[in-house]
């Protein structure tokens, strides 16, 4: 009895299909492992504080927040390079926006005085803790109040990408105990306290 004739092309296709199946079977474990690794990485990124949405304080009374603030420490920022004795002063305007006057000295605490005037507006009416700030229209930046003293004696300001951070005080200096207490809460917000640079305020750093 003669066997059935199988064309060469079909035999070749069958062989290639078998080899492909064998290849996939051999590499299936690697594919599964890779998927597991990707899943773990994604879960880790989601769980990491600096990838989560930055939380702000529950409520800000803007009338109490207005006034003069001294910069105690901050993340390095290109627009503040070589600046000392930095202060910020906020005042409410008739249109509901907030006027900002930032002052600092260039090079040293008795160096040339620099002043920048800008505006801010609330972007979250529920908390008043998220504001948009601009000094050159139409470029706006985020100003999020992420920690605040009950008596409005100090504040911590950040932004959602966590690239910038400022610790502010109503006085030019802050005692070390309070400063360390504020720093201890920063990691849970996705910030690295070691990146902070103390700000010189006149003849001393902003930290006692």
What are these model-derived regions, one by one?
Residues 1, 6-10, 31:
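Short hydrophobic transmembrane-like helices used for membrane targeting/insertion
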Residues 2, 17-18, 44-46:
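Generic low-polarity alpha-helical segments
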Residues 7-19:
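Positively charged N-terminal leader segments that act as targeting/secretion signals
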Residues 27, 33-208:
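A beta-rich soluble binding module of mature secreted/lumenal proteins
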